[in-house]
Design a protein with these regions (language model features):
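Amphipathic, Lys/Arg-enriched alpha-helical "gate/interface" segment within cytosolic domains
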Residues: 1-141
Length: 141
């Protein structure tokens, strides 16, 4: 599965990363794994990095599923980074499903803008201790 996440408890931040071909099933599995992690707190901010996804094979109905929509609290600030048009459009649709009065989900084309919006310092692409939901640890590029 081409997904990984890191939960940075001191910064109250979840960094998610997807790459390669991303399917609906993989996206749902990713969110389930995140929710089941004991370090996860739904009020944490999220930085989702979709820059390395080459194909989005995601059904828009899945974007509105309870598994995805109810994972984070409505007050959690969430930044999705999707530079290509398909990823940006799907992220926008997902944002519409998770609508909150606070407008706490934003879609960006550049990582720097997303980090600034979340109030983070610039960081590299390495997730460090990311939890890889792939079948083998060697599948993470």
């Amino acid at each position: 599965m081409p997904t990984a996440f890191e939960i940075d408890v001191p910064r109250r931040l979840v960094v998610c990363r997807c790459w390669g071909v991303l399917t609906s099933d993989e996206l749902v599995s990713h969110y389930r794994a995140l929710r089941s992690d004991p370090a996860f707190d739904p009020s944490f901010s999220q930085l989702a990095d979709l820059r390395e996804v080459t194909v989005f094979d995601v059904d828009t109905r899945v974007l509105g599923s309870r598994t995805l929509v109810a994972t984070f609290a409505p007050t959690a600030r969430r930044a999705l980074v999707a530079p290509n048009d398909v990823g940006y459009a799907l992220s926008y649709v997902y944002g519409r499903y998770t609508q909150s009065a606070e407008k706490n989900l934003q879609v960006f084309r550049a990582m720097r803008e997303a980090e600034q919006w979340l109030g983070l310092r610039a960081r590299g692409n390495d997730l460090g201790r990311a939890k890889d939901s792939a079948a083998s640890p060697d599948s993470n590029p």
